[in-house]
From Swiss-Prot:
High-level lineage: Bacteria, Pseudomonadati, Pseudomonadota, Betaproteobacteria, Nitrosomonadales
Gene, per the UniProt record: flgH
Oligomeric and partner information: The basal body constitutes a major portion of the flagellar organelle and consists of four rings (L,P,S, and M) mounted on a central rod.
Highest taxon above the source species: Bacteria
Annotated function: Assembles around the rod to form the L-ring and probably protects the motor/basal body from shearing forces during rotation.
Protein name as annotated: Flagellar L-ring protein
Lipid linkage positions (S-diacylglycerol cysteine): C22
Family assignment from sequence similarity: Belongs to the FlgH family.
Keyword Lipoprotein appears in the UniProt entry: yes
Family annotation (Pfam families): FlgH (PF02107)
UniProt signal peptide: 1-21
Residue positions bearing lipid (N-palmitoyl cysteine): C22
Membrane topology, record value: Lipid-anchor
UniProt GO molecular function: cytoskeletal motor activity
TM stretches of this protein: none
Length: 222
């Protein structure tokens, strides 16, 4: 006795496989790696007896601020962007034709005339508004110190819930001059900033439904 699976069963199995493959860490647009460990201090070949070391230099008369690879810095995310776009088109066209007949094949005929007129108008208008607000705080790690002293920072925050995990990622280049008291800097002062908020929950999966799933649903919806 042979057992056959109905097309609906195959469809359910395929969707289950697709759903299991969607529960993965979403891709990122930020610079990786998202963290770095400080380098081990090099062994001094010659000891002059002084207490100053350029490799571990920390100012004594200012707050602790990020300077070296592995240091952390607080990023205050305060992004508020808006865009407005509008456009309009219009066109019009009109025409008229007048014709008259006084004779036909050499014979006089009663006066006849023909009149025709046309008038076309077209108007089109469109408008689009977009606004995005992203606020929050994330601690990032210095992953590289550029020759000019600027800091390449990158960080990730993960918050797990019952049905998914939220990912907040940030990367960019920080000028130490803009680092305020408390070792923090606003995101508006970060160059090449890349900020993202992603989830691997069902909500994010529904928004990025795979092409294969759409193919199945197109001819055999549940």
């Amino acid at each position: 006795m042979q057992t056959f699976l109905y097309p609906r069963t195959w469809l359910i199995l395929g969707l289950l496989l697709l759903g299991s493959g969607c529960a993965v860490t979403p891709k990122t647009i930020t610079q990786v790696p998202n963290t770095a460990r400080p380098a081990a201090p090099s062994q001094a070949v010659y000891n002059s007896g002084g207490i100053y070391s350029p490799a571990t230099y920390r100012p004594l008369l200012e707050d602790k601020r990020a300077r070296l690879v592995g240091d952390t810095i607080v990023i205050n995310i305060t992004e508020n962007t808006s865009a407005t776009k509008s456009g309009s088109n219009s066109a019009s066209k009109s025409g008229a034709v007048n014709a008259g007949i006084t004779g036909l094949f050499g014979h006089n005929v009663p006066k006849a005339s023909f009149n025709a007129a046309s008038d076309n108008a077209y108007d089109d208008a469109a408008a689009s508004n977009s606004r995005n607000v992203f606020t929050g705080t994330i601690s990032a790690t210095v992953t590289e110190v550029l020759p000019n002293g600027h800091l390449v920072v990158s960080g990730e925050k993960q918050v797990a819930f019952d049905r998914g995990t939220e990912f907040v990622r940030f990367s960019g280049v920080v000028d130490p001059m803009y680092v305020a008291a408390g070792n923090s800097v606003p995101s508006s002062r970060v160059a090449d900033a890349r900020i993202e908020y992603r989830t691997n929950s069902n909500l994010d999966t529904a928004q990025v439904m795979s092409i294969l799933t759409r193919f199945f649903l197109s001819f055999a919806p549940l």
